[in-house]
């Protein structure tokens, strides 16, 4: 299992602070929200996974190095 360095974790935390709006681009999970689902970042854990409260009620994390989301600059 790959664990990102402390520097990577801190970089992701700065890039995706709590409250940031994101859109799902890719998630490798059977229960993943549909691509394009929007949500609000709740935080970043110690493995650099982005914890998201998805607008559809899901709470699956965006796993660092596996899944992908993008910041929403305006809605």
What are the functions of these language-model segments?
Residues 2-75:
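Basic/aromatic-rich interaction segments and small domains that mediate binding to polyanionic partners
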């Amino acid at each position: 299992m790959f664990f990102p360095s402390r520097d990577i974790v801190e970089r992701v935390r700065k890039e995706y602070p709590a409250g940031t709006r994101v859109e799902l681009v890719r998630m490798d999970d059977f229960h993943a929200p549909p691509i394009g689902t929007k949500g609000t970042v709740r935080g970043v854990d110690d493995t650099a996974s982005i914890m998201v409260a998805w607008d559809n009620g899901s709470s699956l994390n965006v796993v660092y190095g596996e899944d992908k989301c993008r910041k929403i600059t305006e809605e």
